[in-house]
Amino acid sequence: MAGQLRFTSGKDEDHFQHQGAVELLAFNFLLILTILTIWLFKNHRFRFLHETGGAMVYGLIMGLILRYATAPTDIDSGTVYNCGNLFFSPSTLLVNITDQVYEYKYQREINQHNISPHQGNAILEKMTFDPEIFFNVLLPPIIFHAGYSLKKRHFFQNLGSILTYAFLGTAISCVVIGLIMYGFVKAMVHAGQLKSGDFHFTDCLFFGSLMSATDPVTVLAIFHELHVDPDLYTLLFGESVLNDAVAIVLTYSISIYSPKENPNAFDTAAFFQSVGNFLGIFAGSFAMGSAYAVVTALLTKFTKLREFPMLETGLFFLLSWSAFLSAEAAGLTGIVAVLFCGVTQAHYTYNNLSSDSKLRTKQLFEFMNFLAENVIFCYMGLALFTFQNHIFNALFILGAFLAIFVARACNIYPLSFLLNLGRKQKIPWNFQHMMMFSGLRGAIAFALAIRNTESQPKQMMFTTTLLLVFFTVWVFGGGTTPMLTWLQIRVGVDLDESLKEEPSSQQEANKLDKNMTKTESAQLFRMWYGFDHKYLKPILTHSGPPLTTTLPAWCGPVSRLLTSPQAYGEQLKEDDVECIVNQDELAMNYQEQSPSPSSPTTKLALDQKSSGQTPGKENIYEGDLGLGGYDLKLEQTRGQPQMD
C-alpha cells in the first residue's frame, strides 16, 4: 500500500448523528400530535375514530411526505461490485477506498424479491425499523400490561369460554383462512398472476395464523369508556389477551413445519411434531414467565424492599423484563412468557408491594403500553409508504377480506352454541354479533407479518395485512358505538357492582349437593382454588391463612419460616387485592393521596380503589369452565373461622 491508511468507522459520523436525530424528532412530533388528538377526542367525546386510527392517519401523512419529498442522497448505493477473493459473507467488512478504510456491517442477502427500489434514499431506509424492535422492545410492555391489568374475578368466572375462544377459536380461524386463501392462490395461478409453486399451502396456513391474531384495542377502549356489560367486555378482552399468545406460537410452529421429503406436502410425522412444538413452546413459556413472577413475589415478601419503593419498582420491572429475555434466549416465546408473568405478578406480587410501588407499577406499565401502542400504529401508517417491497394484488387482498370475516363467523357462532349448552348464563345473540364485529386486526398481526418479508409470498402477506389493519381499525373501530346501539347492548354498567350478591355458605352447600353430578367436571378448578388459597398465597404473599393451620404438624418449622407475620394478624380476613389499571383510578389516587404516601390511611385507600371492593369480598368460589358456570365452594380451613 503506497501511503499510510486512514481508518474511519463511517462516511460521515456527524452526518449520521444528525440524520438519526431528525428521524427520532419526526416520530416524537407524531406522538405529540397523537396525544393532542386524543385529548381533543376525549374532550368532545368523539368515538367515531379511535386514537389508534388517528395515529395511523398521522403516520400515513408523514410517510407520504418522506416518500415523495425526499430524494436519494447516495447514487452509488445500488451499484454491485464483485469481490472474487471472498467466498463467504463476513459480519463486518473493511473496505479501502482511495487510501481510506471504511467499516461496513452485514445486513441481509439481496435477491430479486427484496432489493430496494429506493436504494440510496437514506431517510426511507432508516425509517424502516428492524422487525426485531417490535418483538423485543415494543410488544412486551403491551402484552405485560394486558396480563397485569387483568380483571381476575370476571376473567376466571368466564375462563372456560375464554380458553375455548382463544385456543380452539384461533385454530379454527387459522385453518379457515388458510383454506380460503389457498383457493384464491389457485385462482391467481390460473389467471397468470402467480407462478405455480410460488405460493404453497403452508404459506396460506402461515398467513391464516398471523391473521388469527385479533387486537380489538379500539373496541375495548370504547367499551371501557361506556362501561359496557362486563360479561361481554371480559369475553372479548380475555379472548384477545390469550389469542395473541396462541397466534404467535401457532405462527412459529407453522413456520418450522418441514417434512423430510417434500417441504410443502402434508406429512403426518411432521404435523404431530409441529403440534408437539406448539404445546412444548407454550408450556415452557408459561412456566418461564410464572417462575419469574414467583421469584419476584418471594423477594418482595421476604425482604424489606417495600421500605424503598424506588428499588422495589425497579426490581419488579427488571425481573418482569427478564422473563421475556430468558424465554427468547431459551428458544421459547417471550411474548407468552411475559403475558403469564404479568398475570402471576398481579395475582401474587402485587399484594406484597408497598402502596407507592403499587401505584408506580400501574402508572409505569400503563404509560409504556400507551406509548408503545401508539408508536406501532404510527409506524403502520408510515410503513405504507416507507416499506420498499410492497406487493399489491387485488385478488389476494379480496380473498383475505373475505377469509377473515368467514373465519371469524366460523369461530364465534359454532363455539358460542357449544358453550351455551353448558353455561348457566348463556351468551346471547347480540353478544355474539358484537364479538363477530370486534375481530379487528392490529399490532400483533402487523408485527408477525413484518418479521419476515424476504420472499414474494411474505411481502404480499405483509402488504395485505397492513391494508386489513387499516380497514378494521377505521371502519369497525369507528362503528363500535352505533353497533352497540343497534344491538341494544347495555352500557353504563359498573364492573364490580354488576356482580350478583354472593350466596351464603349454607346456600352454596345445598346447591353443591343438589348439583354434585353436574359439577364433577369442575373438580379440577375447585382443587386449584383450594390449593391456591391454602398454600400458594400464604407462601408467596402476606395474605391467606397461616401455613401452620394448613400444613401437617411435622411441617411446623417450614410453615413457620414461610408464613408472613402479617398472616397471623390478618387471619380473620381475606386480603387478596385485584389489580385493575385504568385512568380514572390513577387520577383518583393522585387527588386523594395524603401527604404521607406510606401512612396507613393512604395504603388502605389505594388498596380499596385498586380492588374496587372491600378486602375479603373476593369471590374465590365461583368459576365457569364453559361447562355450566356452577358455583364452587372451598372446604373450611381447619383452625380458621368460616368466611362470609
UniProtKB/Swiss-Prot annotation:
> InterPro entries from the xrefs?
Cation/H_exchanger_CPA1 (IPR018422), Cation/H_exchanger_TM (IPR006153), NaH_exchanger (IPR004709), NHE-6/7/9 (IPR002090)
Question: Which ranges sit in the Cytoplasmic compartment?
Answer: 42-45, 148-164, 225-235, 299-309, 351-364, 408-429, 487-644
**Protein's cellular compartments:** Late endosome membrane; Cell membrane; Early endosome membrane; Recycling endosome membrane
> Per its UniProt record, what NCBIfam families does this chain match?
b_cpa1
Subunit-structure text: Homodimer; phosphatidylinositol-4,5-bisphosphate (PIP2) and phosphatidylinositol 3,4,5-trisphosphate (PIP3) could be involved in the dimer stabilization. Interacts (via the C-terminus) with RACK1. Interacts with CHP1.
Q: Which family does it belong to?
A: Belongs to the monovalent cation:proton antiporter 1 (CPA1) transporter (TC 2.A.36) family.
Q: What is this protein called?
A: Sodium/hydrogen exchanger 9
Q: What is the lineage of its organism?
A: Eukaryota, Metazoa, Chordata, Craniata, Vertebrata
Gene, per the UniProt record:
Slc9a9
